[in-house]
Every structure is written in structure tokens, then in C-alpha cells.
């Protein structure tokens, strides 16, 4: 049985989520108070409905409690976002992801029980900034305030060495959890694995330790 998702708020972020989920082949219900936006996504989502998500009866009648995951992507109206999240929690929705506008909004969402809170603009800005500064870093994902996961292209200083030779965990406190080599992905590589030039290393660790590794081994400023 396919998982069912609902996206409430069809602005730039919510619309992108709706499209991405639809492309994955899952059932998606798209909802917005703006009729034009709903019409725009009528052919993309499995169902598209006009409705006020701050009205508990509307969410009940739509059967939101039966959905596996609801994404609250309401734009500028923080009050509507908070109230919608509260109603969804009271309805017993299994998983709720909410777009936060600022740190205050995030704190409130956390207190009322949102399962996942995202800051799309802030998070994307951090990824772009990190990628600009670090030429060897292909991608950057913030896991928490202190830890990140990055994709690093192996340079000549790393190539030809085994993971044991480099001893990255002991020296820098970070872990190489996978290696992408062409179309091959080596998950949990052995200590005897030799790194090739242009391998993509999937590294996880604290932001401070990853930065230290980049500066000393990858020669980033």
C-alpha cells in the first residue's frame, strides 16, 4: 500500500515538495486557501483541494488523520502555520513536517510537537556558502547545529592511501561512511580500501572537525 502525503501551502517550497513527491509516485494531496494555486497543482497532485487549514472541521472532513505524513508549508502566516500544526497533532497525524520562518517560529513548533522542522532558505544558504568556500566539497547537509554530512572529492593528497593510512577518524574525529566511485557506491568501506583520485567521500562529523579536515587536507581557506 502506497504511503499517503499531504502538502498544506502551495507556495514555492510547498509546490516544490508536492512536485517532488508526485514524481516519486506516491499519493499526494495538495491543499491551499488560494484557488489559483490549487488549480495550478490539480494535474500534479493526486488530489488538490481549496481549504482553510486553520479550520479543524475542514481537516477532519479531508481525513488528514489517515495520512502517513503531512507537510505544513504555509508561507508568511506564522499564526496559521502554528494553528494548523496544533490541529494536526490533535488529530493524531503520524508525522508532521513544518516549514519555519524564523528561530522563534521554530521554538514554538518544537514545543507543540512538530516532528520535523525545516528552514529551506537558511539551510540552502548554508549549503551554497559552504560549496563556494570549499572547492572540493560537492554537497553539504546540516544534520544538527553541530554535525554535518558532506560529499568531498578526493584530491591527490588522499589518493593512493588506504583509510587505515589516513587514520582520519583518529586525527580529525570524522568518519568516511561511504565512497562513490563512478556508478559504484561502497558503503561502510573497510580500513584496507584504497582511495582513488576523484572518488567522492561521504563524510560525517562535527562542523568544526570537518572544517579542520578541509583546511589541512584539502587546502581550503
UniProtKB/Swiss-Prot annotation:
GO BP terms in the entry: potassium ion transport
Gene Ontology CC annotations of this record: plasma membrane
Primary location recorded for the protein, binned into one broad class: membrane
Keyword terms: Cell membrane, Ion transport, Membrane, NAD, Potassium, Potassium transport, Transport
Location in or out of the cell: Cell membrane
Chain sites annotated for binding NAD(+): 12, 32-34, 52-53, 74-76, 99-101, 105, 121
SUPFAM superfamilies in the cross-refs: NAD(P)-binding Rossmann-fold domains, TrkA C-terminal domain-like
Domain RCK N-terminal stretches: 2-118
Source species, domain of life: Bacteria
Domain RCK C-terminal: 135-219
Keyword Cell membrane: yes
InterPro entries per UniProt: NAD(P)-bd_dom_sf, RCK_C, RCK_C_sf, RCK_N, Trk_Ktr_HKT_K-transport
Inactivation phenotype: Impaired potassium uptake.
Membrane topology field: Peripheral membrane protein
GO MF term (any one): monoatomic cation transmembrane transporter activity
Self-association and partners: Homodimer, tetramer (dimer of homodimer) and octamer (tetramer of homodimer). Part of the KtrCD complex formed by an octameric catalytic ring of KtrC and a membrane associated dimer of KtrD forming a potassium channel.
Family the entry assigns: Belongs to the KtrA potassium transport family.
Function description: Catalytic subunit of the KtrCD potassium uptake transporter. The 2 major potassium transporter complexes KtrAB and KtrCD confer resistance to both suddenly imposed and prolonged osmotic stress.
This protein's name: Ktr system potassium uptake protein C
Organism (species): Bacillus subtilis (strain 168)
Protein's gene: ktrC
Amino acid at each position: 500500500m502506497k504511503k499517503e502525503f499531504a502538502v498544506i501551502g502551495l507556495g514555492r517550497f510547498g509546490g516544490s515538495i508536492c512536485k517532488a513527491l508526485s514524481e516519486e509516485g506516491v499519493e499526494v494531496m495538495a491543499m491551499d486557501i488560494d484557488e489559483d494555486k490549487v488549480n495550478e497543482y490539480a494535474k500534479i497532485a493526486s488530489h488538490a483541494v481549496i481549504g482553510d487549514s486553520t479550520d479543524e472541521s475542514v481537516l477532519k472532513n479531508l481525513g488528514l488523520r489517515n495520512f502517513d505524513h503531512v507537510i505544513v508549508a504555509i508561507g508568511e502566516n506564522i499564526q496559521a502555520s502554528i494553528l494548523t500544526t496544533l490541529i494536526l497533532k490533535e488529530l493524531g497525524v503520524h508525522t508532521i513536517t513544518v516549514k519555519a520562518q524564523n528561530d522563534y517560529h521554530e521554538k514554538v513548533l518544537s514545543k507543540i510537537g512538530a516532528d520535523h522542522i525545516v528552514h529551506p532558505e537558511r539551510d540552502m544558504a548554508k549549503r551554497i556558502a559552504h560549496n563556494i568556500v570549499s572547492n572540493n566539497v560537492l554537497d553539504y547537509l546540516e544534520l544538527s547545529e553541530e554535525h554535518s554530512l558532506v560529499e568531498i572529492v578526493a584530491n591527490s593528497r588522499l589518493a593512493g592511501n588506504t583509510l587505515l593510512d589516513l587514520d582520519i577518524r583518529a586525527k580529525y574525529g570524522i568518519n568516511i561512511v561511504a565512497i562513490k566511485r563512478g556508478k559504484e557506491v561502497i558503503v561502510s568501506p573497510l580500513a584496507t580500501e584504497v582511495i582513488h583520485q576523484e572518488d567522492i567521500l561521504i563524510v560525517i562529523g562535527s562542523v568544526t572537525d570537518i572544517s579542520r579536515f578541509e583546511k589541512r587536507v584539502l587546502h581550503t581557506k
